[in-house]
């Protein structure tokens, strides 16, 4: 069930990795999936999608409310302010006010929970800018499910 939530959201942003956008999309949401190195990355811009508020240690909702509210963190990275802004524009058009498809669940459109302007990461030796958009995901059992 939780994998379906993660997969439903990722299905909205993974097409950004294909042409013409060609922006790599990474996630460490389940099973310790790989994240990109933050230094020396071969691509000039990329995004990392993570989740919070979902029980991610297994597939079941046992012990959790049938109504799920989670947060989707989309971290944008680029070598310039403009690249990060471009990445935010692309991911926002893919996620904002869109309903992920999750089998057996009634899903509300994704809402912007908070947003951050691109800013330089001063801890990195190479130029790196970053910004985080946070979306709220709310699902409930589908009627008749």
Label each PLM-derived region with a short phrase:
Residues 1-12, 52-67, 103-145:
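Short, charged interaction patches at domain edges and termini
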Residues 1-62:
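Small/polar-rich, solvent-exposed N-terminal microdomains that initiate assembly or binding
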Residues 92-102:
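A common structural junction motif
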Residues 84-85, 94:
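Hydrophobic alpha-helical segments that drive targeting, anchoring, or assembly
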Residues 2, 87-91:
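Hydrophobic alpha-helical membrane-association signature
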Residues 76-83:
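A generic structural motif
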Residues 67-75:
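Active-site-adjacent structural patch at catalytic or cofactor/ligand-binding sites
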